């Protein structure tokens, strides 16, 4: 028995498909003028939705052989000058950034289905900036910065705990100064790309490129 052709739904027309896509997608990105304002807006939204560390970001560098290296760190500050994080400057990432002062950042907010990719040049923050941020850290974190030879071989967990205890005794109840090997890096972006999920994998990509002291924008195919 053949099927009744009247019971088989007709394939949607091109106009029907376009209408479905438009009805299912959110409005376009609001700002195409200031990437930092748009980033601040997205970060604020992430702070309300992400269960942990909405300021977490991947920092990608290259080593002496050109081999890429990535790790998660926490964004601690940003403004029109760039994006700042703090670390042990003798760590693997610190040495790589000192030798090759360029980096890529990636923010991925799964709860929002959004990501931001940043590429730029790197420079150390000022001594005053590093001192101010270190002073704001919890005391145990300050002591940990002295105790950990970050990225160096560790014989066992006890060795680290012993170092922490030794540093705790050394500083007692007094102020813990910032270690000379602990500071921050600022990534000054040359490119910032905002990506937002849309139905049917027709995602939205908006790219800001630095040019003549300002920004140019372009959209990319998903």
Curated annotation (Swiss-Prot):
Pathway: Cofactor metabolism; pyridoxal 5'-phosphate salvage; pyridoxal 5'-phosphate from pyridoxamine 5'-phosphate: step 1/1; Cofactor metabolism; pyridoxal 5'-phosphate salvage; pyridoxal 5'-phosphate from pyridoxine 5'-phosphate: step 1/1
GO biological process, one term: pyridoxine biosynthetic process
Residues at which substrate binds: 76, 133, 137, 141, 201-203
Key words, A-Z: Flavoprotein, FMN, Oxidoreductase, Pyridoxine biosynthesis
Binding site for FMN: 71-76, 86-87, 93, 115, 150-151, 195, 205
SUPFAM superfamilies: FMN-binding split barrel
Obligatory cofactor(s): FMN
Enzyme class: oxidoreductase
Source domain of life: Bacteria
Cofactor remark: Binds 1 FMN per subunit.
Reactions this protein catalyses: pyridoxamine 5'-phosphate + O2 + H2O = pyridoxal 5'-phosphate + H2O2 + NH4(+); pyridoxine 5'-phosphate + O2 = pyridoxal 5'-phosphate + H2O2
PANTHER family xref list: PYRIDOXINE-5'-PHOSPHATE OXIDASE, PYRIDOXINE-5-PHOSPHATE OXIDASE
Similarity annotation: Belongs to the pyridoxamine 5'-phosphate oxidase family.
Annotated protein name in UniProt: Pyridoxine/pyridoxamine 5'-phosphate oxidase
Organism whose genome encodes this protein: Caulobacter vibrioides (strain NA1000 / CB15N)
Lineage: Bacteria, Pseudomonadati, Pseudomonadota, Alphaproteobacteria, Caulobacterales
Gene: pdxH
